[in-house]
């Protein structure tokens, strides 16, 4: 009998998660069926109920579902509650309880290690303040790293405990303070869906030794990643984080470790 997995989001045009699900399960000796299900926010509760009813083992979530998913799971992990974000859901067949977790932060720490950056000492600046950004920031804090700086279009809401705690570490998009933060970043992460024209440019605006990470991904490296590489910077797109967070998703679902190489190979094979 095949394991059934899915990825939910809207849009899902370039998702690679089904390939990663199948490759990870194959590495564990499990047959797997995985599908991409375009899911608007208002359809999320009913979709999760259907997947649980039909015997799915779990699913991954992408934008814009990570934050609303917190209210759709019976038992969110402590990390998911702190980040107010869920990207991995497990449907427990034994208890019938729907479990929610966020693996973005743990995957980000693995990505930094792969790129030779010490999470405990690197200066991270996040562009955006949504669920993914919170997951990354909290993971850095739990590793004992320097508190991250955040640049976003909107000031954190008064009731947002994480955003409110940023204080002077938050800067408004386009401000002089934001420009200074970006210029001092050792790791600069775009956690928004914005395109290249709206993002800080590599030549002159970003430190030459910085690592640039663009969380969105598509069929080819983004224009921002391409420009950063052309300027001589180390740069990776969201596929790198996707692979690392997928390994942690498998731990949530099966309590087993998946080797990194089969997942990387699956991404390389994908169109």
List the predicted regions and their residue ranges:
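Short helix-loop-beta connector
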Residues: 117-123, 207-208
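Conserved S-adenosyl-L-methionine
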Residues: 142-147, 231-233
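NAD(P)-binding Rossmann-fold cofactor-contacting core
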Residues: 145-166
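Rossmann-like adenosine-cofactor binding region
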Residues: 166-236
């Amino acid at each position: 009998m095949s394991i059934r997995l899915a990825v939910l989001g809207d849009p899902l045009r370039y998702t690679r998660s089904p390939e990663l699900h199948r490759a990870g399960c194959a590495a564990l000796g499990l047959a797997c069926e995985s599908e991409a299900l375009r899911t608007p926010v208002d359809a999320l509760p009913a979709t999760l109920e259907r997947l649980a009813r039909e015997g799915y083992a779990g699913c991954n979530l992408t934008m814009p579902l990570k934050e609303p998913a917190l209210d759709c799971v019976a038992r969110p992990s402590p990390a998911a509650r702190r980040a107010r974000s869920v990207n991995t859901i497990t449907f427990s067949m034994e208890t019938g309880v729907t479990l929610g977790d966020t693996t973005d932060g743990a995957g980000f720490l693995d990505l930094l290690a792969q790129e030779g950056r010490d999470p405990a000492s690197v200066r991270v600046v996040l562009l955006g303040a949504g669920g993914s950004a919170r997951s990354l920031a909290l993971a850095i804090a739990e590793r004992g790293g320097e508190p991250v700086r955040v640049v976003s279009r909107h000031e954190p809401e008064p009731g947002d405990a994480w955003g409110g705690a940023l204080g002077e570490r938050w800067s408004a998009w386009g401000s002089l303070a934001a420009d200074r933060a970006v210029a001092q970043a050792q790791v600069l992460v775009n956690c928004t869906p914005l395109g290249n024209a709206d993002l800080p440019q590599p030549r002159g605006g970003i430190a030459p030794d910085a690592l640039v990470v663009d969380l969105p991904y598509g069929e080819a490296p983004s224009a921002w990643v391409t420009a950063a590489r052309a300027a001589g910077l180390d740069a990776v797109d969201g596929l790198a984080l996707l692979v690392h967070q997928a390994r942690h998703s498998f731990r949530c679902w099966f309590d087993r470790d998946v080797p990194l190489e089969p997942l990387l190979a699956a991404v390389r094979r994908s169109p």
